[in-house]
Amino acid sequence: MAVLGTVDRQLQSGDSELAGQFQGILVSVDPDRDSLETLGAYATAFSPRFLGVTGSREDLVELTTQVNVAFAKVPLAEALTQEAPSPEALADAYTVDHTGNIVIINPRGHYHGFIKLPHDPETIRLTFQTLASQF
């Protein structure tokens, strides 16, 4: 999100019409931990125009499959090494691994592609400008 915030600021300082078309959206793949309020606060810390969203596990699987993003809930090793961990401890002892791609959705709302790591603000800005000029 930080790199998207940088791109947003670059666009805001340049072409205001183009800047108005740029939208950053953080999609959390951990709805058990990430509330909409938390996501909204996190996303707007990078730009007041950014959104934070999530959904049910089924909806997230459908979305991530469509946009070539992988994610998996991974148990933390320290919880598994406890002699008799409680069910609560096991339920909360995980991380979520996920692809670090930036997904590009075109102005018509269709999946356009993605940008792999490492994320360079200038590459993202140029990609966005090129895409915006086609619509």
Question: Where on the chain are the PLM-derived regions?
Answer:
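Thiol-/selenol-based redox modules, centered on thioredoxin-like
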Residues: 77-135
